Amino acid sequence: PIVSVLKNKVQLFTLPHLNNQIQGAGSFGWPPVHGGQKITKDVWMDYLQKLYMNHNGKPFIASAFPQFHDIYHQAGIHKSYGYLDSSEGNTFEVTFQTALKSSSEIIQVATWNDYGEGTMIEPTKEFGYRYLEFLQAYYIKNHEHPFNKKDLQLPIKLYQLRKKYQNNKSISRELDQASLLLYDSRTKEARDILIKHSH
């Protein structure tokens, strides 16, 4: 196999139905769409529970996903895999909580920005910051955390200002500083710079 040339031992994870094709591979969860059908909550909950309970001692990665609404048919690629509704954010919350209750050491968020399959949690006009706010609220509940909901919007503000002032070297340097502050979790200082140029 391809991994035989690697110096360090690796653990491979596949979709559950492909798991038996690679000896010793673990599985990861994914929205269980198939046959172009609309997948109900009962179906995807059953899928996740079986994955988390019946892994036969093999490692597995739990999965949290917001929905599945692919564009394959509309794009003329092939038939749609199916549809799994967001239920106004409830699907993500339930899959995340179910993943937390599993014995998995890792939770995969499926996905950050897969617009082709409609599984994105990245902020959009349709969903706003719903998914990031949920994750932030969960984290804050369990950890000391100085951030708030408005901090989630600072990267897009930085991006918009970079576009607006792309030919202004002086302001661009200040925006570079704001970027470094954001990377360093110093959101108040970064926000002050961004507000200064948001007129």
Map each language-model feature to its residues.
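Glycan-processing catalytic domains of CAZymes
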Residues: 1-199
